UniProtKB/Swiss-Prot annotation:
Belongs to the osteocalcin/matrix Gla protein family. One of its GO terms (biological process) is glucose homeostasis. The modification 4-carboxyglutamate is found at residues 11, 15, 18. Gamma-carboxyglutamate residues are formed by vitamin K dependent carboxylation by GGCX. These residues are essential for the binding of calcium. Residues 1-41 form the Gla domain. It comes from Diplodus sargus (White seabream). This is Osteocalcin 1. PANTHER family: OSTEOCALCIN (PTHR14235:SF0). Ca(2+) 3 binds at residues 18, 24. SUPFAM superfamilies: GLA-domain.
């Protein structure tokens, strides 16, 4: 399902992830999908 997220959905995930410094750092290295699911669980879309 990760490949089917819209840019708007990805941006909203980034906004959540950026509130958590560890998640933001992981996003920079692993990507937003991996970082979000690691810290917040399954993507809700």
């Amino acid at each position: 399902a990760a490949g089917q997220l819209s840019l708007t959905q990805l941006e909203s995930l980034r906004e959540v992830c950026e509130l958590n410094l560890a998640c933001e750092h992981m996003m920079d290295t692993e990507g937003i999908i991996a970082a979000y699911t690691a810290y917040y669980g399954p993507i809700p879309y």
